[in-house]
Amino acid sequence: MRAAISEQLGYMRHIHDPVPESYFAVKRQLELRAAENDFATQEEYAALCEANGVTEPGDQAILLRFLHDLGNVLNYGDPDDPHKLQDTNILNPEWVTGGVYKLLNDRDLLQTGGVLERADVQRILGADPRYPPERHDFILGMMKKFELCFDIPDALGQSYLVPELLLPNEISLDWDFAQTLNFQYDYNVLPDGILPRFIVRMRTRWATGGNAGARA
């Protein structure tokens, strides 16, 4: 088994590329920082790179991808990403999941039928010093990226819909299935969260109406 793994590793791209010692110096500094900090801004990351000899922006970007792949730093940044996540480098993944679960598990929010207001975000996350106000948009952006919520149209960024928290009320609908095109998907095991994520992904179609069978 060891020999087979070694053989396959030899086929991987960049496996034999030399890695500058300065990259490991930055990696060690970030590991030390992670003991006391949940995240680092892009400006802080760039300063740390500069201090350890990684001065070119292109090299800093390559190193950040390297650290992301290793799991030392998680960065979901993309200049074209509408969620604007590139300025926050995650040193402690639990910080993100903890913030998300604070929102999803809030007792008052469970009564709103899935509607999350900006004031709710400030109330829930603002009670914990680990989530300063300037990082609230990042937590929301991560929820949008992973299809946990989306902006309610015409709410000017002040209201969001969290499908996972929709009330389980069913409506009575008289639908003539004989006159429509029907698709049926069968799962041996229905993955958790697939219907809420489906709602997020198809949100632009909900504006003109939609109906999903209750037996899914």
Where do the language-model regions lie?
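Extended, non-catalytic interaction/assembly segments in eukaryotic proteins
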Residues: M1-A216
